[in-house]
Curated annotation (Swiss-Prot):
GO terms for cellular component: cytosol. The keyword Ribonucleoprotein does not apply. It comes from the Archaea. One of its GO terms (molecular function) is GMP synthase activity. PANTHER family: GMP SYNTHASE [GLUTAMINE-HYDROLYZING], GMP SYNTHASE-RELATED. The keyword Transport does not apply. Pathway: Purine metabolism; GMP biosynthesis; GMP from XMP (L-Gln route): step 1/1. The gene is guaAB. This is GMP synthase [glutamine-hydrolyzing] subunit B. Coiled coil: none annotated. It comes from Methanopyrus kandleri (strain AV19 / DSM 6324 / JCM 9639 / NBRC 100938).
Amino acid sequence: MFDPKKFVEEAIEELRREIGDRKAIIAVSGGVDSTTAAVLTHRAIGSHLVCVFVDHGFMRKGEPERIRELLEEELGLNLRFVEAAEEFFEALRGVTDPEEKRKIIGEKFIEVFERIAEEEEAEVLVQGTIAPDIIESERGIKSHHNVGGLPEKLNLDVVEPLRDLYKDEVREVARYLGIPDEIVERMPFPGPGLAVRVLGEVTPEKVEIVREANAIVEEEVEKAVEEGKMSKPWQAFAALLDCKATGVKGDERDYGWVIAVRIVESIDAMIADVPEVPWEVLRNIQDRITSEVPEVTRVLFDITPKPPATIEFE
């Protein structure tokens, strides 16, 4: 049986051995993986850790501001906030292949971190990589920005304190470390963010559409859970398909984007199933998206489990 107390004690000792008196940086997204890795490392080396939050332009609605508040004020981490949206959008210009997008985002992340690391005179990069990330990357299912995107000649030593843990174990460790429930229970969110929920080329306009649609999905699912209409899913989100469809708004023909809604249940992200979501919930999601996001004319519901599909679309 997994013992979070024992894991934390051993991980802190190992981090101290691996990092020593060197300065380290870690990418924090506000998710449970990176936050747990950050708090764990902070316990081990204190002020020698610099937490770097990169706003790549692909975060959920209102997320950068809230994450900054949680990490700085509530957890007391030493945080550097980097605005880099223009860099990421430019790097992804014209790119449509999902693997290429993930690789580019990973490389850009490392490029930004190396720049910050040089300014901070850091020698170690701590990552919140967990077991499913490594397994999917090794099997060639999909690259993860904190696994497959690493350049061969990385100028920093890489430390991954959570690499042997699955998501449910990470949450146990997070609770033991006193991390707020808002982070512990936060739905998993991919490192590349909304960029992998935009099929085809990633543009600021497309990201804004999926950001608004995604917020609606999360709000409606959270409301349904609170009202006892459904159990809390592993993930619930919106993806923007790389196609348009004809619609009718008012008395006029419209030609707009198609949103796919994805709701899944899982324990460790290795396999996932699709729950029977109440029809009322799906209708509410559709009504709000097509009325509040004018660029969208059609909303679909994805019923494919993992396998054969992956949880994210890209």
